[in-house]
């Protein structure tokens, strides 16, 4: 089967290292009864491994040439469904299953952050997620309060999920090699976060506004939203910087606005 050309506009870097692929599958630990959704399967390198472990696999691929390639490659497979769709627009709840989805993929680095936010909006139908991402993005997701990497993505990802940095992947594991290191992360949805955000759009807005002015105090960064008299009620020091606030702090700020 002829090789497919890579499209730069889709940020395509195809994983080829069998050791890394086996390590990813081991981390996912798929079961026969699972429903797996692979985002951006490319030429099917990871797909081949997943098919031996799982009886229900859905592929979401935007590149029409790769979709044709995958349809031909897997035309005898009865346990695979291929969706030609933009993952940023895909309705993950449309995948037919009686169990929550397990979502995996080597995410295109140029859309990884908006794609994560799209997945957070559909977190109710997801059991867990395992992704290859740019190492810098994984560090931001898992960053601790007060660290340089802690920001908007950290807060929102940690509100929705428990996140674990699993291992690093070198550029040489890909064709063509990206200019940055990659990393594998596991995200498990949280269904009992306390306090609960009353309005997720409001929470996202507060976090985005605060980190737009991360060098200012949070009192100044959020002065359009929070009156000085409200800070004592929140029990939050308005002289702190946004990166010094916990996820719980941001939820409390969001909730007082409703």
Curated annotation (Swiss-Prot):
It catalyses: adenosine(1518)/adenosine(1519) in 16S rRNA + 4 S-adenosyl-L-methionine = N(6)-dimethyladenosine(1518)/N(6)-dimethyladenosine(1519) in 16S rRNA + 4 S-adenosyl-L-homocysteine + 4 H(+). Its EC number is 2.1.1.182. It is found in: Cytoplasm. InterPro entries: KsgA/Erm, rRNA_Ade_diMease-like_C, rRNA_Ade_Mease_Trfase_CS, rRNA_Ade_methylase_Trfase_N, rRNA_adenine_dimethylase, SAM-dependent_MTases_sf. The keyword Cytoplasm applies. The keyword Transferase applies. Keywords: Cytoplasm, Methyltransferase, RNA-binding, rRNA processing, S-adenosyl-L-methionine, Transferase. One of its GO terms (cellular component) is cytosol. S-adenosyl-L-methionine binds at residues 13, 15, 40, 61, 86, 106. It is an enzyme of class 2 (transferase). One of its GO terms (molecular function) is 16S rRNA (adenine(1518)-N(6)/adenine(1519)-N(6))-dimethyltransferase activity. One of its GO terms (biological process) is rRNA methylation. Gene3D superfamilies: Ribosomal RNA adenine dimethylase-like, domain 2 (1.10.8.100), Vaccinia Virus protein VP39 (3.40.50.150). Belongs to the class I-like SAM-binding methyltransferase superfamily. rRNA adenine N(6)-methyltransferase family. RsmA subfamily. Specifically dimethylates two adjacent adenosines (A1518 and A1519) in the loop of a conserved hairpin near the 3'-end of 16S rRNA in the 30S particle. May play a critical role in biogenesis of 30S subunits. This is Ribosomal RNA small subunit methyltransferase A. It comes from Coxiella burnetii (strain RSA 493 / Nine Mile phase I).
């Amino acid at each position: 089967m002829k090789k497919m050309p890579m499209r730069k506009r889709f940020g395509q870097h195809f994983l080829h290292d069998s050791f890394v692929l086996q390590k990813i599958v081991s981390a996912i630990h798929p079961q026969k009864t699972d429903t797996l959704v692979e985002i951006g399967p490319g030429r099917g390198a990871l797909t081949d491994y997943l098919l031996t472990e799982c009886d229900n696999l859905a592929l979401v691929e935007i590149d029409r040439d790769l979709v044709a390639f995958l349809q031909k490659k897997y035309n005898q497979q009865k346990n695979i469904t291929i969706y030609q769709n933009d993952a940023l627009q895909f309705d993950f709840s449309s995948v037919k299953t009686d169990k929550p989805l397990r979502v995996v993929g080597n995410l295109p680095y140029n859309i990884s952050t908006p794609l994560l936010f799209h997945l957070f909006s559909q977190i109710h139908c997801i059991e867990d997620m395992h992704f290859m991402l740019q190492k810098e993005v994984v560090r931001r997701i898992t960053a601790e309060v007060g660290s340089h990497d802690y920001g908007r993505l950290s807060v929102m990802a940690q509100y929705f999920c428990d996140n674990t940095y699993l291992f690093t992947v070198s550029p040489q594991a890909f064709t063509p090699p990206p200019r940055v290191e990659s990393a594998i992360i596991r995200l498990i949805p949280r269904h009992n976060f306390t306090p609960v955000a009353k309005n997720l759009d409001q929470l996202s807005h507060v976090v985005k506004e605060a980190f737009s002015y991360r060098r200012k105090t949070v009192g100044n960064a959020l002065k359009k939203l929070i009156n000085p008299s409200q800070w004592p009620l929140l029990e939050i020091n308005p002289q702190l910087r946004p990166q010094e606030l916990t996820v719980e702090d941001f939820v409390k700020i969001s909730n007082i606005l409703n």
